[in-house]
């Protein structure tokens, strides 16, 4: 069992209007989403899932089973929400993080699920289903992800790619263990896509008995890192009903 899988939020539950938990894409960690703290509404309690084997848990074994990882995150999240269980809960996941967020939503009832650059279960291609990437493919994927956050000097980029490639490889193996839930959620699901991403923008209508919306924003598969303000603006728009009408 893994522990300390969630970052420490800066806003206390008592002062918050919404509990937002974000799940990064494969191969990354919390660093790519920390900047959201500066642009999210001040009364949103923001937490990032910190997966094993990277950042503060560097050297820890990687997670090998997505369902068990979702169990561990859900247990920690339930404990954190125990004193304020009625605070609206929203789970956000980027790419692989969207599938992990979906599994957690089946374990901890959420008020909304937002997935980014993540096709619905059953519409994922072979690469999305955990096919191992060769050395060159891994390097291209990692370089694209890192450059989406900010431009990096070529020499430093090579070093960062070398450090990050094993994380992405482990996450691709983790993705291969994903099994789609057999029952739908009861919360709304918003699916966000980049207009430069080859993924076909489709709603997650089969995964919920509630509303399922699909929106296309400007950017590549890594539009979450490329245009964080646009993503946060879209979150504010789609989550207005969850916050009782407050934008």
Model regions and ranges:
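Non-catalytic, mobile gating and regulatory segments of ester bond hydrolases
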Residues: 1-247
